[in-house]
């Protein structure tokens, strides 16, 4: 009996001519963020133009963009350029951030290992932490002058306490079972610190560093407002004296970019460090002490 073959086109399977269903366009998080930024900037520009808001009060976005482009196009070697003032402020931020964070972390390590010392220092740390640092800035400038040293000292003061407090909390938050497990394996105090306490404290330390990064930018501008010869804070004061509000907003953008870059670098380092951390000692079958 001969088999009957289906005729071409008689099968129910779709051919290449069948139109494919189109998937709905979906925007990612970054696309939505960019779209929101465009809408906000467009609304800003349109609102200022429609309501005839004076430029010295709220400049249009186009004026801010022109001022920013003019500042970026200037020679980086000119002492009145945006690049020169930015380099001064970035130097102050980095020096103050690293010095203040390092001191806060070092003292946090020592204090967390000595409960009695922590109890003695706790009221003084609380009192100094609640002290408004902006009010102390003029005194620091009087002590250290208008140079970079006074700004670094102000930034150190602002970044010291977040790292100190979070590092102490992190070293105290270690699981006691991990300590007991390592001690049962005859681990030395240094090995306990390296394999249990320090890994447990890392998330707390990075949280303090992220807060300190934001405070570092604020501290640099406060110090330059109080007394400085160069820096973005000085540039803002000069532009405000000339009623150049668009130029001031362009400096605000540069400061925001500096803060974003610093926090992004910290976040990348945090992801890399925490990703390559050894597994929890309590969950390992063997611990190489």
Language-model regions: role of each:
Residues 95-125:
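Transmembrane-helix boundary motif in ABC transporter permease subunits
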Residues 126-162, 169-170:
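Generic hydrophobic transmembrane alpha-helix motif, especially the helices
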Residues 163-211, 232, 236:
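Short cytoplasmic-facing helical segments at TM-TM junctions of multi-pass membrane proteins
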Residues 233-270:
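Hydrophobic alpha-helical transmembrane segments of polytopic membrane proteins
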């Amino acid at each position: 009996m001969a088999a009957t073959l289906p005729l071409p086109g008689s099968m129910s399977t779709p051919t290449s001519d069948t139109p494919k269903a189109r998937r709905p366009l979906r925007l990612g998080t970054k696309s939505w963020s960019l779209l929101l930024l465009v809408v906000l900037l467009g609304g800003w520009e349109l609102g200022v133009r429609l309501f005839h808001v004076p430029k010295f009060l709220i400049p249009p976005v186009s004026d801010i963009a022109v001022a920013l482009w003019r500042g970026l196009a200037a020679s980086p070697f000119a002492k009145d350029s945006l690049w020169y003032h930015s380099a001064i402020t970035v130097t102050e931020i980095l020096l103050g951030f690293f010095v203040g964070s390092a001191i806060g972390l070092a003292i946090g390590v020592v204090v967390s290992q000595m409960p009695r010392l922590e109890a003695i220092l706790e009221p003084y740390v609380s009192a100094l932490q609640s002290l408004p640092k902006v009010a102390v800035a003029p005194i620091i400038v009087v002590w250290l002058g208008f140079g970079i040293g006074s700004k670094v000292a102000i930034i150190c003061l602002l970044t010291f306490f977040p790292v100190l407090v979070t590092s102490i909390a992190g070293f105290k938050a270690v699981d006691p079972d991990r300590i007991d497990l390592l001690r049962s394996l005859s681990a030395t105090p240094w090995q306990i610190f390296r394999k249990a306490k320090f890994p447990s404290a890392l998330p707390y330390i990075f949280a303090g560093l992220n807060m300190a990064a934001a405070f570092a930018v604020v501290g640099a501008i406060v110090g330059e407002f109080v007394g400085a010869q160069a820096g973005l804070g000085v540039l803002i004061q000069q532009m405000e004296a000339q009623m150049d509000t668009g130029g001031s907003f362009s400096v605000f953008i540069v400061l925001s970019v500096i803060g974003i870059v610093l926090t992004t670098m910290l976040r990348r380092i945090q992801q890399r460090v925490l990703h390559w951390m050894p597994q929890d000692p309590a969950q390992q079958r063997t611990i190489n002490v």
